[in-house]
């Protein structure tokens, strides 16, 4: 049976948007083994994908080339005898390891002029394929062939035992309905709903008898503390207190998720959680959360602003209207319009 190495994207959201590609490969090649090469910060997500047999975790950070290290890893991977590699990032360096591993078929987009490193080249027509999920899915087809109808949306396995252990460690319970807030956004502050809005929203939910958990990385710990304090501890700050795998498992019990445009937003959709997705400087046109049904996601933003989306890390005009004017009342209406959660 064929063995294929997937070079996974470097962002959590992009990684989940690549899952329909994996389903398509399995459809085209029954019995295929898919392994994935993934950075440490996304490996936990890839490991929860049923299409993936094995995750090879790397420590390559954004930026440095580390050519010698990539050469050594590629040489070591020669013993795996992969038949093909599919390279999802467009960077030059992401195509080096399959080349050094001497994998016969190396598939990907031209990207950063990767002639020679790749030998099955796709040219990307961004206007024809505006959605990132469809762009990735194109790599399962022959160059120039149309993308097949989407087979599946992202889906992540949940580790029930790990969830219970994490809840016990953190002193959490599910005696009340749980809402999860994801206050972070790796890209920058222009994608983050203000802390005072989140705190106000947490108090409104607490008044309804809802338990509010804040999930995020250690980078979000400070803003989580701020939200918890402003909410009178209506929100429990778990940012930085779990790894990504535990965050996935905790999120799986949420009755609702409210998230900025971030990796955890895509995790919520993959878990079938009813989701209010908040957009400010970014747009859902290219990388929307993919859910089992559109009714599970409420895309929420301020319409009619000429300056939005600006795709900037910080508001270039200083007023931050796109998220400042997104009121807790509006978000509560969106949350109330959501259907019940699906089984995770």
What are these model-predicted stretches?
Residues 1-344:
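Catalytic machinery of carbohydrate-active enzymes
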